[in-house]
Amino acid sequence: MNRQLMEAYIRQKRASPGMVQASDLQINRPMSGMRSNSRELHAYDGPMQFISSPQNPDQILSNGSPGGITPVAMNTSRNHSNNMRSLSTINQEADLIEEISSHELEDEESSPVTVIEQHQQSASHSANSTQSQKPRARQHSFSDNLDEDDYTNRNVAGAAPVRPAGMASSPYKDATLEGSSNGTGNGTGGESEGDVIGNIDQFVMQPAPQGVLYKCRITRDRKGMDRGLFPIYYLHLERDYGKKIFLLGGRKRKKSKTSNYIVSCDPTDLSRNADGFCGKLRSNVFGTSFTVFDNGNKESTESPRLDLAVIIYDTNILGFKGPRNMTVILPGMTEDDQRVKISSADPKQQGILDLWKMKNMDNIVELHNKTPVWNDETQSYVLNFHGRVTQASVKNFQLVHDSDPEYIVMQFGRTSEDVFTMDYRYPLCAMQAFAIALSSFDGKIACE
């Protein structure tokens, strides 16, 4: 009976809060990620021979009675020296862990970093707090420089279509507006990103205003029974915060002797008889020449079918490897920034292609793809797409005029397997730019 009482007494004494438990110096971080005002209490690992003074925690007192009785004889000077060294080591580790945790909490803060100025500090701040703020300010300054350099490197890495070409980092830095009324103008100084104005069917046919850049994205849908051979292409205008506005959809007609694409502003009905039918793209037998038409009727005299563009790809009969060479002929622009009406269906006048073959350039504008530069380091052709194109493709191109090769009228390139970017400016409209991009998708027997 006495033995059982003794064991119960010992178990109760060991479980009492006065006994010191072992601790591994873990710091409990709050789940919310916010600062915690509570401080961790650290205990000494192993049997305790000394206790700390309640007035001064750093002062070590002998484990004796309050009356000052001498310590137990088992405590030798050697044990005392070892315990003193262990206590000093534990205190240093605790200070180090506390300092590391404070830096980790600083890194988790999302508030903006402000420069610490000496004249704004209150006189009540002690010298210790001032000294502790200086390394924090240096740490934030280093973090700011690191973030800025990392952002710059990311921009440089995305400046070329696939790899950095060492070109200008500012998009269209020296571009001048072709056809401006005063003959001058900077492509970036007063340039803004375009938005949809009015109805979609009217907007896609209207030439882009001068000084406005339209950033678009083309997605290719190859899902379904026959989408592998006849995919559907969707054109969206990119807006802020990842938003996008649908503009046009296009698909290749199945029963056609040559490549024939239907373009509509109604994504649910991509047929020629649909209300949203905007025009079509038709190629020759070899796929080297494409003509873009609007939604007019070639048999009608009141609203005849108009020519919007002609795209010509240079033939590559010998099969030399390299980028495509393309020529784009557009109708000229009037003084009020409207297209000159040219119709190949009208027997009284010549079409765009006929005018170009006869070198009659009065009412047409000729564009060419910008010649890419060969990079010996990457063993590839590179162009500066200013971060808008991220993957190499034979379809990537930029359209420029010979009089001003720095003014990018249109650029097109791949960002993923079925996603492409398409940016265009004056004098193109969305219908013309989308049709030019569709011609790049089409297979070309004599150009590959």
From Swiss-Prot:
**GO terms for cellular component:** ciliary membrane; cytoplasm; nucleus; rhabdomere
Matching Gene3D superfamilies, A to Z? Answer: Tubby Protein, Chain A (3.20.90.10)
The biased composition feature labelled Gly residues covers 182-191
Q: Where is this region: Disordered?
A: 103-195
Compartmental location = Cytoplasm; Nucleus; Cell projection, Cilium membrane; Cell projection, Rhabdomere
Question: Carries keyword Lyase?
Answer: no
Phosphoserine PTM positions read 141
Q: Matching Pfam families, A to Z? A: Tub
Q: Keywords of this protein's UniProt record, alphabetized?
A: Cell membrane, Cell projection, Cytoplasm, Membrane, Nucleus, Phosphoprotein
The disulfide bonds in this chain are: none
Compositionally biased region (Low complexity): 118-133
Q: Which GO terms describe its biological process?
A: protein localization to cilium
Q: How does it sit in the membrane?
A: Peripheral membrane protein
**Annotated InterPro entries:** Tubby-like_C, Tubby_C, Tubby_C_CS
PANTHER family this protein is in? PROTEIN KING TUBBY, TUBBY-RELATED
- Family statement: Belongs to the TUB family.
Q: What is this protein called?
A: Protein king tubby
Organism, scientific name: Drosophila erecta
